[in-house]
């Protein structure tokens, strides 16, 4: 049984990242599921938003100014254990494209990295808790990202 997710705008996502994006998203989620040895099939909603909407979400949920690339909203942040519906991830493709140019990498590279980052937040990996937890989270994120890039021929 594959992990499940929904995307609020398949058209926009295909426009920005190509037609095979769903397989890449499934791969990211499956690798995280396997790495964390989860016994359930995680579900999440992937929301594609404009820079304006992302700026509003950033202010509303994180009390920060400006546009960001990814925001995760965890449904079960204070519960013990995980439920199959774990939350929502908001991505801003225009901001990701802008960052890709700035950092000299492909939009797909940043998309997968941001998706993994967002998923880890849904699984309560919070790099802002402490410097030690940031190191563990970023190491785990980099390991998963490297695996995804090796397996996903893009």
Swiss-Prot record:
Pfam families for this protein: YbeY
GO molecular function: metalloendopeptidase activity; RNA endonuclease activity; zinc ion binding
GO biological process assignments: rRNA processing
Organism field: Mycoplasma pneumoniae (strain ATCC 29342 / M129 / Subtype 1)
Cofactor note: Binds 1 zinc ion.
Superkingdom assignment: Bacteria
Cellular component terms (Gene Ontology): cytoplasm
Protein family per UniProt: Belongs to the endoribonuclease YbeY family.
Biological function: Single strand-specific metallo-endoribonuclease involved in late-stage 70S ribosome quality control and in maturation of the 3' terminus of the 16S rRNA.
Enzyme class: hydrolase
EC number(s) on file: 3.1.-.-
Cellular location(s): Cytoplasm
This protein's UniProt keywords: Cytoplasm, Endonuclease, Hydrolase, Metal-binding, Nuclease, Ribosome biogenesis, rRNA processing, Zinc
Listed cofactors: Zn(2+)
Binding sites annotated in the UniProt record for Zn(2+): 117, 121, 127
Protein name (database record): Endoribonuclease YbeY
